[in-house]
Regions:
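RNA/tRNA-interacting regions in translation and RNA-turnover enzymes
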Residues: 1-285
Length: 285
C-alpha cells in the first residue's frame, strides 16, 4: 500500500479540528523510489539538505501550549479532525506540562509509543488477570491512550518522541534541524540523533544504518523519514492533495524472527479431513 489511512474521531472523545492539517507521508519501498524523490526535489530547489530520522511505530498526536503551559492534546484522527485526549497525555511523564520558554502559542507533533519493557510488563499483568493480552506495542499504546480512566493510562509506561513544530508564535526558526534542537531545549523528548546531509548517498547510508539498528532499539520503528531541512525550500516544494512534497517515508520490510515449534495439533473435520496446526513459541515482532 502507498497510503496510510487515518482513523475517524470517536464520539466518546471530544472532536478537535486541526488548524494545521496533520498530514501523512508518501511511502517508498525501494532505493529507486528514494532517488526519484531526490530528483523531484532537486528539480525545484537548489542544493537541498535532508534530515534523516527513524519512523516511530506509534500514534501521532498534537500537543498545544499557551504561554508555555500545556493546554490540549489530540490524536491525528483523519488528519483534519482528531480526538481530545488531553487527560491521558498529561499522565505521560515525558510530556512537559510547562516548557522553558513561555511562548504565546506552540503546537508540536509527536508519536506516542510503548517501549518494549513497558509492553512486556503490561502483557504479564494482563495474563495474570486472565485478560486478553495486547498483540503488539502499537496496539497497546493505542488502547492505553484511549482509556476513559487516565489512572489506567498512567500505569502503561507510555512515552513520546516529538518530531515537528506545527505552529509557533514568539520565535522564528529556519530549518527542521534547528527546530529539533529547540524542541530539545524546551524539554521535549526527540530522537537521539537526526543527521543532516547534502549528499543523497549519505542519506541512503543512514537509512540502511537505522535499519541495521532496528532490532536493538527499545521501541518499534517501521521505517525512516527523509525531510528537506530548509523551511523556505519546503514552501517552494509545497504539497500534493495527500502528501508534502518535501518529505518521504522509507518502509523497511517486515521483521523476521526465529521461533521454536512446540507441537503439531491435528484437527479432524466433519468429512474426515485432517488439518495440521503448528503450535509455535511466541515471539514479539
Amino acid at each position: 500500500p502507498t497510503k496510510k489511512v487515518g482513523g475517524k474521531a470517536d464520539n466518546s472523545f471530544a472532536p478537535v479540528a486541526h488548524t494545521v492539517r496533520m498530514e501523512s507521508l508518501q511511502d517508498a519501498f525501494s532505493t529507486a523510489e528514494l532517488r526519484d524523490f531526490d530528483r523531484r526535489v532537486q528539480g525545484s530547489v537548489d542544493h537541498p539538505r535532508y534530515v534523516v530520522e527513524p519512523k516511530i511505530d506509534g500514534l501521532s498526536v498534537s500537543l498545544e501550549y499557551r504561554d508555555g503551559v500545556f493546554v490540549r492534546g489530540s490524536t491525528r484522527g483523519d488528519g483534519d479532525v482528531g480526538e481530545d485526549v488531553s487527560g491521558n497525555l498529561r499522565v505521560i511523564r515525558s510530556i512537559p506540562l510547562k516548557i522553558k520558554d513561555p511562548l504565546p502559542y506552540l503546537e508540536v507533533r509527536g508519536e506516542v509509543y510503548m517501549p518494549h519493557r513497558s509492553f512486556e510488563q503490561v502483557v504479564d499483568r494482563q495474563q495474570i488477570a486472565g485478560e486478553k493480552p495486547f498483540k503488539n506495542p502499537r496496539n497497546a499504546a493505542a488502547g492505553s491512550l484511549r482509556q476513559k480512566d487516565s489512572s489506567v493510562t498512567a500505569t502503561r509506561g507510555l512515552d513520546i518522541f516529538v518530531f515537528n513544530i506545527q505552529q509557533i508564535q514568539g520565535k522564528t526558526l529556519h530549518s527542521h534541524k534547528e527546530s529539533l534542537d529547540y524542541l530539545k531545549y524546551l524539554g521535549f523528548h526527540t530522537v537521539d540523533d537526526f543527521p543532516c546531509y547534502a549528499d543523497f548517498d549519505k542519506v541512503l547510508d543512514e537509512i540502511h544504518a537505522i535499519g541495521e539498528r532496528r532490532g536493538d532499539l527499545e521501541y518499534d520503528i517501521d521505517g525512516a523519514v527523509i525531510k528537506v531541512d530548509d523551511f523556505d525550500q519546503r514552501q517552494v516544494l509545497g504539497s500534493t492533495a495527500k502528501f508534502p512534497k518535501w518529505a518521504i517515508a522509507f518502509k523497511y520490510p517486515p521483521e523476521e524472527k526465529e521461533t521454536k515449534l512446540l507441537d503439531i495439533e491435528i484437527a479432524v473435520g466433519r468429512t474426515g479431513v485432517l488439518t495440521p496446526t503448528a503450535v509455535l513459541e511466541s515471539v514479539h515482532l
